[in-house]
Swiss-Prot record:
PROSITE patterns reported for this sequence: GLOBIN
Alphabetical UniProt keywords: Acetylation, Heme, Iron, Metal-binding, Oxygen transport, Transport
Species of the source: Hoplosternum littorale
Amino acids binding heme b: H88
Location of N-acetylserine modifications: S1
Note: This fish has two hemoglobins: cathodic and anodic. The cathodic Hb and anodic Hb display small and large Bohr effects respectively. In addition, the cathodic Hb displays a reverse Bohr effect and appreciable phosphate effects.
GO CC list: blood microparticle; haptoglobin-hemoglobin complex; hemoglobin complex
General function of this protein: Involved in oxygen transport from gills to the various peripheral tissues.
Quaternary structure and interacting proteins, as annotated: Heterotetramer of two alpha chains and two beta chains.
Keyword Heme: yes
A GO biological-process term: hydrogen peroxide catabolic process
Name of this chain's protein: Hemoglobin cathodic subunit alpha
Coiled-coil stretches: none
Chain ranges of the Globin domain: 1-142
Length: 142
């Protein structure tokens, strides 16, 4: 579970990346689609899954908007992110293992673009946060 220190580190780190969050989301999604091509099945309705695709850019922005919302609701992720869980479980029927894959790609992208801020402490706390968010997103599957 997230400690008070974890929460403080996550909030501070997200504050540093917030201005580039859309680009982080876009790159993380591109990485996921390229490195884990099986994830493309959830986006088969898009006409273009290339890195320059408008759909991919838009969804990257959507992803990071949800992460930002979760940072704001860090003290009650399950209650605060219930709609996200409902959407992915009941409407989109996304395999919950994909949340972990996306989280990993968000971490990689943050490490690449924010090396000075992505300290080992931040890495651990942000990873724990994304794991908690992934678990929350998968909550309705249980």
């Amino acid at each position: 579970s997230l400690t008070a220190k974890d929460k403080a580190l996550v909030k501070a780190f997200f504050g540093k990346i917030a201005g580039k969050a859309d680009a982080v989301g876009h790159e993380a999604l591109v990485r996921m689609l390229v490195v884990y091509p099986q994830t493309k099945t959830y986006f088969a309705h898009w006409p273009d899954l290339s890195p320059s695709s408008e759909e991919v850019k838009k969804h990257g922005k959507t992803i990071m908007a949800a992460v930002k919302e979760a940072v704001g609701k860090i003290d009650d992720l399950v209650g605060g992110m219930a709609q996200l869980s409902d959407l992915h479980a009941f409407k989109m029927r996304v395999d919950p293992s994909n949340f972990k894959i996306l989280s990993h790609n968000i971490l990689v992208t943050c490490a690449v673009h924010f090396p000075d801020d992505f300290t080992p402490e931040v890495h651990v706390s942000f990873d724990k946060f994304l794991a908690a968010l992934s678990s929350t997103a998968a909550d309705k599957y249980r």
